[in-house]
Amino acid sequence: MRKTKIICTIGPASEHEDVLTRMIKAGMDVARLNFSHGSHEEHQGKIDLIKKVRQKLHMPIAIMLDTKGPEYRIKTFENGKIELKDGDTFTLTTDDIVGNQERVSVNYENLIKDLKVGDRVLVANGIIILQVRELKGNDAICDVIAGGTLSDRKSMNFPNKVMKHAYLSKQDKDDLLFGIKNEVDYVAASFVSTKQDVADLRSFLDENGGEDIEIIAKIENRSGVDHVEEICEIANGIMTVSYTHLRAHET
């Protein structure tokens, strides 16, 4: 029996019956659906297709719902994007402005309260690395540690912080109810920071008919690493995310 399982993300290239059939025959064990993108209608089509093919092949392919998780994003720029260079100064602000070469708005109103000087902010999946130099009013004035192209509505991650928010957003709750209705097998919980995050998710699933759904906690920040042992006490498994391109910038 093969103990290592293969998880495959189902996207535009694979959401076809012939492609999915070949993937299952090649060894796919779990079909992952990324709820950071797509509507419930689109995901319903994928789930129906997975169930159809696994029944046809008599293969017990599991379905994993990967949550969007707590979402922190920058807003928009005047021209849609900018170029940042190493050593530049760039400001994140909670003021509602249209971004430019010097600053951009964020969607998290408590950003300034939660940050401190020296904290790092990873933007656009870690391609852009900022380090907080000064906190002033509604602004976090940052040094650009790793530059690159930065465009509208890119994600932000805070690897060394536990941000003060409720773990389950309204969208996550809606997605989880959708997953319970469709009898998914696993929930991959994004940006788990503490054991309590998993406990909150477990309670929500249990209270809404999802007692049989197993939780895979995704470790994506420093707090998750620091609390991984206690997270493992309550989660059914963990998944780690590795930003290998960040290694050259570690201190």
Regions found by a protein language model. Give the residues of each.
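Beta-strand/loop-dominated core regions that host nucleotide or nucleotide-derived cofactor-binding catalytic loops
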Residues: 74-176
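Alpha/beta enzyme core
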Residues: 170-182, 225-243
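Glycine-enriched alpha-helix->loop->beta-strand junction motifs that scaffold or abut catalytic
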Residues: 27-30, 183-185, 206, 233-238
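Short beta-strand/loop segments at the ligand-binding rim of alpha/beta enzyme cores
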Residues: 2-7, 60-62, 158, 162-163, ...
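Conserved small/polar residues in nucleotide/adenosyl-binding loops
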Residues: 244-251
